[in-house]
């Protein structure tokens, strides 16, 4: 499948290949990856645990892939970081999750004088960054919900081909990004 078509630059950009590695690993071990996604998308389980298990499982699969063939030696990363995982969660549950990009988080936090975290993709710091980011986004969404004029402006820009964004999560992303 075409990563640009499915997620634009969310999963593919310069030197960032989570979509390509996801397809590669899913082709190599489809049941492993299917199981990892089922656990990632299981809302009954805590998000930090799901995040950690998904990353660890992708790393184990990547290692098996790399060892399976000398031609696979360049597969040094699975690229399944906070950004990629936020895309998967947001695509599945768009009314609950937000698209995460570290630079957007840092720049917006700095603009507001909030403390932002160093970029990280592993362990408690990554989980803490995701929780902090989601809290910041929820604060913005709360303000958007109190502003009917902003809501109307946002809805007016969407046509029938657009996701209707009933919870204003994409509008929140626009506010953070721009």
Model-found features: residue ranges?
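An N-terminal alpha-helical hairpin/helix-loop-helix interaction module that forms a charged
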Residues: 1-78, 94-178
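Contiguous, well-ordered alpha-helical segments that form the cores/surfaces of helical PPI scaffolds
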Residues: 84-92, 106
